[in-house]
């Protein structure tokens, strides 16, 4: 099972539904849930930090990003929280948008395996990661944001500024499936 920490984003149920379409069991839990409570359930194989409107209300997400040995995927606000937890900089976007944008994948990697080097995604840019921590690398960027996706250099921790769970994002299901593979789920190809 994958747990989705609910940071109050409008697409949190869409994340769960997208995982259901992939036949991956998922459960939405409050963002006040501790890492200890999560790892006490041996069926949990991965964690998604959802988007949301307010970084100050994302209670335990930074601690989970720092200390989880389970794979973690941060979406939108979740992506920002991961970066912030490791010492990255998050601030207002230069171009505040909520729109369809072109994403450019720097090179094929485990999160974007099977995804073309350029695709369209639905993204929210009110706040964004401005500087990544030293232990992360940039996986993808756009014309309006130089850091659309990141990965920890040693752990299975990923962040995406855009929303792979919505139908407007091309290959969003592939990106989510790739994360689920990192969590140990297998799929017929």
Swiss-Prot record:
Keyword annotations of the record: ATP-binding, Glutamine amidotransferase, GMP biosynthesis, Ligase, Nucleotide-binding, Purine biosynthesis
Start and end residues of each Glutamine amidotransferase type-1 domain: 1-189
Catalysed reactions, as listed in the record: XMP + L-glutamine + ATP + H2O = GMP + L-glutamate + AMP + diphosphate + 2 H(+)
CDD domains registered for this protein in UniProt: GATase1_GMP_Synthase
Keyword Acyltransferase in annotation: no
Active site: 76 (nucleophile), 163, 165
Protein name, per record: GMP synthase [glutamine-hydrolyzing] subunit A
PANTHER family for the chain: GMP SYNTHASE [GLUTAMINE-HYDROLYZING], GMP SYNTHASE-RELATED
Primary gene name: guaAA
Species of provenance: Methanococcus maripaludis (strain C5 / ATCC BAA-1333)
Pathway(s) annotated for this protein in UniProt: Purine metabolism; GMP biosynthesis; GMP from XMP (L-Gln route): step 1/1
Secretion signal, residue range per the UniProt entry: none
């Amino acid at each position: 099972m994958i747990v989705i920490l609910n940071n109050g984003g409008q697409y949190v149920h869409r994340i769960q539904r997208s995982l259901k379409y992939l036949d991956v069991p998922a459960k939405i839990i409050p963002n006040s849930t501790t890492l200890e409570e999560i790892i006490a359930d041996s069926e949990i194989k991965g964690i998604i930090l959802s988007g949301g409107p307010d970084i100050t209300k994302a209670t335990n997400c930074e601690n989970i990003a720092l200390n989880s040995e389970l794979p973690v995927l941060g979406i939108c606000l979740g992506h920002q929280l991961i970066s912030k937890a490791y010492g990255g900089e998050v601030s207002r976007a230069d171009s505040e948008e909520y729109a369809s944008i072109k994403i450019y994948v720097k090179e094929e990697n485990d999160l974007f395996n099977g995804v073309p080097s350029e695709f369209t995604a639905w993204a929210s840019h009110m706040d964004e990661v401005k500087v990544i921590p030293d232990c992360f690398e940039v996986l993808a960027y756009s014309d309006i944001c130089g850091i659309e996706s990141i990965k920890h250099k040693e752990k299975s921790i990923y962040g995406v500024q855009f929303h792979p769970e919505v139908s407007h994002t091309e290959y969003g299901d592939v990106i989510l499936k790739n994360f689920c593979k990192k969590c140990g789920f297998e799929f017929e190809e």
